[in-house]
Amino acid sequence: MTLRKLLALSCLLLPMIASAHKFETNQRVPPVGIADRGELILDNDKFSYKSWNSAQLPGKVRIVQHIAGRTSAKEKNATLIEAIKAANLPHDKYQTTTIVNTDDAIPGSGMFVRSSLESNKKLYPWSQFIVDSNGIARKAWQLDEESSAIVVLDKDGRVQ
């Protein structure tokens, strides 16, 4: 599957996945910074976190996946994520950014959500995983609770 086909498929699915949002076509996503937890970093088999900001999004074509820290939200995007994996897109031009809202997780499951993210980071070290412990991105982007949203960005970080 080519990058162009993947982006076309994503754009077709976008209205079904993200109904309420604050995204505008050809604009950057509303600014958001996540300092509590933030981006999951894997360095020499050790995990750490660093602050993350949406200003870091330009530079590559991206699919930004924002999901509640719930299995039901993750399952909504499973078909698209499998298509991305199968497409074997070049890591120097494409990146998936997954923002997980652990503030919107089933009580007591946050530890399991973070463990799952760590496993995925080991499998897909080129992907970006962001832990949003306070639901900052969901609030800034006006997303539905207990759900997911997919946003396709061009290399300049503009919504497509």
Where do the protein language model's features map onto the residues?
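A short, hydrophobic beta-strand/beta-hairpin element that forms part of a small beta-sheet core
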Residues: 148-160
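A short beta-strand-turn-helix
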Residues: 32-61
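Short, internal strand/loop/helix patches
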Residues: 95-99, 111-144
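Hydrophobic h-region of N-terminal signal peptides that target proteins for export
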Residues: 11-19
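Short loop/turn microsegments at loop-to-beta-strand junctions
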Residues: 30, 146-149
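Cleaved targeting-peptide boundary
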Residues: 20-28
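Structural microenvironment flanking redox-active thiols in thiol-disulfide oxidoreductases
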Residues: 65-120
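Bacterial N-terminal signal peptides that target proteins for export
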Residues: 1-7
